[in-house]
Every structure is written in C-alpha cells, then in structure tokens.
Amino acid sequence: MTVRSALIASTLAFMLVPAPRALAQMVHNDVQVNPDSLIQAARDASRPFLDVNNAADGHYFPVLGCVSGQQDGAMGVHYLNGGYLLDHGVVREDQPEALLYEFRNGKATLTAVEYIVLAEDWDPDHPMQPPALLGQLFTYTSFPNRFGLKAFYSLHVWAWKNNPIGTFVDWNPTVSCDDAPTH
C-alpha cells in the first residue's frame, strides 16, 4: 500500500465514523435496551410536580415561554431547576433539570422531563463521549442556539404524554403552544 492510498483509506475511515457529538445529535430515538426503566425513573422524579403549582416547591421556575417547532409540534413550557443545571455536569435520573408542561384551556399538564448537561461541564471529564442515562444517549445542541444557552446536551423523556414519534425525541407533534401563557 502506498503512502497516498493509506492516507486516503484512513481519511475515509475517519469520515465514516461519526464523532460522539454528531452521534449525540443523530441518536435520540428509542435506542436503549429497556426504555421502561428510564420512563419510570422520570415519572418517580416528577410525580410531585404533576400539579404545576408544586413546581416552585422543587425550585422549578418557568423559562423561555412555550417552545414550539416549525413543523414538529412543540416541547411545551419549560420549568427549570437552576441548581440542577449548574451542578457541574452531574447526571441523576431522580433530578431532571426541567419539567415540561402543556397548557390547554387554562390548565397545565406535565408531559415530559428534560435532563440537561452543559457541554462545558461535561466535556472536560468525558472527552469524546456524550452523556447517557440508563443507556439512553443525550442529544447535543451547539451554540448559538434558539434558547440562548451555551452548548449543551439534553435528553427528553415523554413520561406523562405519549409521543408518537418516540419517547426520547425532542419534539412532540401532539403538544401545542396555542394556549400557553406568555411569560
């Protein structure tokens, strides 16, 4: 094998192997072996907040207003626990960083939880490896982004409302922002 052909072969091999961040962006569907354990963990962690009036007791407060997609439905209104977000990259199934609520007819319904890890907290100790929770990989969102956040990893778990396109997909086509309050 010539040096030139070896260089071409190694370049092609490198191009065909997705980088961990690219993998984290691509793999967000139901790829874990047992999704029920993560769904149950998310329900256990968020059960006290089924009533949105209890969210503040858990230090969850509304941010961003209702997040909707251009074609893919919405996420809903995020209630964020800043302490969990700023915990230096700790991933715990019993401490979701955000609760997602859908508002319809003046009533808030808990639909999902979101686990969020800032890339600057995760990457130094876990180079080339996206976070995972109970086998489910997080997705990567670069900076700049529509949320105004630094680069981050996230994992949505539609624990309280069925998502027909996947339990761990970011957007839910059955969620709407039409009745959401403007914060």
Feature locations, PLM:
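Sec/Tat signal peptide C-region and signal peptidase I cleavage site
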Residues: 19-24
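Bacterial N-terminal signal peptides that target proteins for export
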Residues: 1-8
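Primary mode marks residue(s) on the alpha4-beta5-alpha5 output face of response regulator receiver
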Residues: 25-183
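Bacterial N-terminal signal peptides
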Residues: 9-18
